[in-house]
Amino acid sequence: MAGSRRAPLVVAGAVGILLVAVVRSYTGGGDDDRTNATGGNGKDGCTTLHVTASSEKAALLKQLAKDWDGDVAGGCVQVTVTSKASGGAADALARGWDEAVDGPRPDVWSPAASSWTQLLRQKTTALDKPDLVGDDALPSIATSPLVIAMPKPMATALGWPDKALGWSDVLRLARDPRGWASVGQTYGAFTLGKTNPNFSTSGLHATVGTYVAATGTSSDLTLADLRKPAVQAYARDVERAVVHYGDTTLTFLSNLQQADDRGEGLRYISAVTVEEKSVWDYNQGNPTGDPTTLGQHRKPRTPLVAIYPKEGTLLSDSPYAVLKAPWVDEPVQKAAAAFLSYVRSDDAQKRFTQAAFRRYDGKSGKAISAANGLLPQEPKLVLRPPAPNVLAQVQTLWAEQRKPAKVLLVIDVSGSMGETAGADTKLELAKAAALRALDQFGSRDDVALWEFSTPLSGSTEPYRQLVPFTPIKAGKALLRKEIAGLHPEGGTALYATTRRAFRVMSTGVTADRISAVVLLTDGRNEYAADTDLKTLERELSPEDTALSVRFFPIGYGADADLPTLRVIAQAARGAAYDASDPASIDKVFTAVLSNF
């Protein structure tokens, strides 16, 4: 199955693999995302075609769909495009798509890479369900190789672009306690941004690439390889440099842009695994990759450059899978074929290459240039993905070898959490989501629980520890009990609680664990004893980004102060999550805990 090949870079339709940068949207997308998702006749008698696409290309596909004058057998076609993480879409299709949870049901699925269609096939087989994608090779609509993106001065210090670099260089810097000082630089510890391989293609492919590098060969990765102690040690030591994980590389790229805006582009992170196209997006000042926002932000002072791992890298091939499902009837199938023909046309492919994708046949455009931090002659060694059972085992093994986390859960129990949200209160929905989310923690994670409002009965402080830090295995029963017992009272002491949580966590930060606070709140600061956001922002900003406490606040409900939560998250090098629709809280908790 898998293997490797030397240049040229050609992936015409069959198997490929790469990254997905996931756009975070839990409250619904734009107007296109809310149209009818079921095939058949749409508005004005048109055939409606719903495409679910990985986010790095969803915005461009939306533009192409809008520009396309669809006509099949004399009838019009209305194409809508929804962005969804490849891993999340694969899980949803395997268990049975629920539009209330997963969004519009797709007729066509275009994940970032064919690895996800292989994993979907394995999942449906295990569940004794029909195959939704078939065994045939799927046509590609664009390609982009996985790269290790690094601030240009750091990469230059390692010998870029003349020296071949790769995972062995990452491993050397990760293992050496001197970090960058081991190569005569003053950048501090080596830190790596890498997404969760259960959700993100970049995370999956970076993990696969690490294992392939560990074998010392470019041949097929096998289950026997994954069992070798030396291979596991290599991968585990690379994971030691990770600052946190997550469902999207956009968290890292957005934080890096904000650091660059402050003149700190060399302080946030040493490297992040992304697709080649994302390096171009970042260097244009547009890390989201959305064509509609291009030019709205200046280019970075410190650009990124792409390192193409010398041990070989994997590709995204953006497969176009017309689902073999009862709702995809003949008119929809014809519409899907017509839209594919348009997307692969020279005019549409030019739009892809202008946005720094490579064509479906692997050819690059002018955007892939050294001036943009990209090397058109690379990658010299392209790896094909391993067999589906090996991919699944990579995900399983990562869960055992990933960097463990120390996470403080902080839940708002102010009186407004007792307000109704559908059939339940906001607090009841949040409690149910938090209880389900506990199963996402790894066996080596330590978790604690606080509640907060304004000073609670019997206390002079607005926060209260309910469960101290304890290994999740030993503490899960107590965590469940205390979460289930939460009840609403009081106001919202957001700043004081955030400040205290940071100080408590800061006393126990170690390089071998991800230290983080997950704080859920439905309001804004109402505590007169602490109203100083500016001081809080300065306190949260780390001097040492390798030894810092990261905040992942959740703005819950329509009245949450999301702008302030973004300030907190940016200061603490985390990410803020929008759950303004209380019904989205399950998805949001899943996304938040993907960081660990």
Could you say what each language-model-derived stretch is?
Residues K403-P471, T497-T498, A516-T521, P553-Y556, ...:
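Von Willebrand factor
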